[in-house]
């Protein structure tokens, strides 16, 4: 008997849980886990984690003082909350957790460095070795340079929002610990651009990750490849053998429920024998290739905006929760603002493209799985009552 796809995948690839839901992590027992503002936002709405949110807000208020504006307290609380969830996750997984730098700093090298140092300091103050934490940074040229400096300080980085081979090469040359190429978002772009569907073996996201993996193994780079943002288990099957794959709970369930033979598709020995041209990636070459790669440039910009929107939404939720804790009631106003932040065209629905956050969060909120989030669904998801005009 071959066993489940998930069990077989674990024999050739490190499986990472793409969620902030601690109970889901306990269910699937991954080695590592990743978080981002969208995942933290979803987890923060779950009743079982409300005490973590409340304690974090109270700590941030005490740290900044009674005169500090709620927005400032919420911003500080986000950093603290990301670490608080990270600590809970690290009590379960044997490996590492990825914690994300504010996406609004994506083009600011110095600010990214300072934020990375701050996050690591918080983990170390809680008794966690920096070896168990990856700092997630967007794969801009400025972000890659920040990661290079952090890596020199022993702070390991996960470069995210990676869509082009040029980004991957720059990360490897910078000595980054790990990259997260976004398989599903690459597929989304090509489907929209061409109007056609793709079989898993020809999926542009799968092809991109395969190319990056083979390049790394051919030239002996130590940077690990962690495929991310999957749309279906077919993509995962085609990347069996990749260093790591970060997978949402929904797809982990499908892999666990599917019994079929899993064939390894990515292999370092095979990659070493391929004929591949080596490219030196200085800033001029990076910027030229990025400008020429419309998919990568559009998806990077979109991803940064999406993570920024998720962070803004989370900060609004935290500010509202703080107001409730301090005796002010503003939940409905905050909810309306959050819904309109994501409903870009004002049609009363949030599509997956408008959401631009993590697929796991979208799927959790999209209760009827029709590809659109209504005001009622978002209201249920964040515990608010929808009273939009």
UniProtKB/Swiss-Prot annotation:
Q: What is its EC number?
A: 2.2.1.2
Q: Which residues form the EF-hand domain?
A: 330-365, 365-388
SMART domains given for it? EFh
Q: Name one Pfam family in it.
A: TAL_FSA
Q: Which InterPro entries match?
A: Aldolase_TIM (IPR013785), EF-hand-dom_pair (IPR011992), EF_Hand_1_Ca_BS (IPR018247), EF_hand_dom (IPR002048), TAL/FSA (IPR001585), Transaldolase_1 (IPR004730), Transaldolase_AS (IPR018225)
UniProt xrefs under NCBIfam families:
PRK12309.1, talAB
What name appears for this protein in its UniProt entry?
A: Transaldolase
Species classification:
Bacteria, Bacillati, Cyanobacteriota, Cyanophyceae, Gloeobacterales
Q: Does the keyword Transferase apply?
A: yes
Q: Which GO terms describe its cellular component?
A: cytoplasm
Active site at 136 (schiff-base intermediate with substrate)
Q: Which GO terms describe its biological process?
A: carbohydrate metabolic process; pentose-phosphate shunt
> What role is this protein assigned?
Transaldolase is important for the balance of metabolites in the pentose-phosphate pathway.
Pathway(s) per entry: Carbohydrate degradation; pentose phosphate pathway; D-glyceraldehyde 3-phosphate and beta-D-fructose 6-phosphate from D-ribose 5-phosphate and D-xylulose 5-phosphate (non-oxidative stage): step 2/3
Keyword terms of this UniProt record: Calcium, Cytoplasm, Metal-binding, Pentose shunt, Repeat, Schiff base, Transferase
Under Gene Ontology molecular function, one entry of this record is:
calcium ion binding
What is the reaction catalyzed? D-sedoheptulose 7-phosphate + D-glyceraldehyde 3-phosphate = D-erythrose 4-phosphate + beta-D-fructose 6-phosphate
Broad EC category: transferase
Q: What is its main location?
A: cytoplasm
* Gene designation: tal
Q: Where in the cell is it found?
A: Cytoplasm
């Amino acid at each position: 008997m071959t066993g489940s796809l998930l069990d077989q995948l674990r024999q050739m690839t490190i499986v990472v849980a793409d969620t902030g839901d601690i109970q889901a992590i306990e269910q699937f027992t991954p080695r590592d886990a990743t978080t981002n503002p969208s995942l933290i936002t979803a987890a923060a709405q779950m009743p079982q984690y409300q005490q973590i949110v409340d304690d974090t807000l109270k700590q941030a208020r005490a740290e900044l003082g009674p005169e500090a504006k709620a927005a400032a307290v919420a911003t500080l609380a986000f950093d603290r909350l990301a670490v608080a969830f990270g600590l809970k996750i690290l009590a379960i997984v044997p490996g590492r957790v990825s914690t994300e730098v504010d996406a609004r700093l994506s083009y600011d090298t110095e600010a990214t460095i300072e934020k990375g140092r701050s996050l690591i300091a918080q983990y170390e103050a809680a008794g966690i070795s920096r070896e168990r934490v990856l700092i997630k940074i967007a794969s801009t040229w400025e972000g890659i340079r920040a990661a290079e400096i952090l890596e020199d300080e022993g702070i390991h980085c996960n470069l995210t929002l990676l869509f082009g081979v040029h980004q991957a090469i720059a990360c490897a040359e910078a000595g980054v610990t790990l990259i997260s190429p976004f398989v599903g978002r690459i597929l989304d772009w090509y489907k929209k651009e061409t109007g056609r569907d793709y079989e898993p073996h020809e999926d542009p996201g799968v092809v991109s990750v395969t190319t990056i993996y083979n390049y790394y193994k051919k030239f002996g780079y130590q940077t690990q490849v962690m495929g991310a943002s999957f749309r279906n288990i077919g993509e995962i099957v085609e990347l069996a053998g990749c260093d790591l794959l970060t997978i949402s709970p929904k797809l982990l369930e499908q892999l666990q429920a599917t019994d079929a033979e899993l064939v390894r598709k990515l292999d370092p020995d095979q990659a070493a024998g391929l004929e591949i041209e080596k490219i030196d990636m200085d800033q001029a070459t990076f910027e030229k290739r990025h400008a020429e790669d419309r998919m990568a440039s559009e998806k990077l910009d979109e991803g940064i905006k999406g993570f920024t929107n998720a962070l803004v939404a989370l900060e609004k939720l935290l500010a509202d929760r703080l107001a409730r804790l301090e005796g002010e009631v503003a939940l409905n106003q905050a909810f309306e603002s959050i819904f309109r932040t994501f409903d870009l065209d004002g049609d009363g629905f949030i599509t997956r493209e408008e959401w631009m956050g993590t697929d796991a969060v979208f799927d959790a909120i999209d209760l009827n799985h029709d590809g659109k989030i209504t005001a009622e669904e978002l209201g249920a998801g964040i515990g608010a009552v929808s009273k939009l005009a």
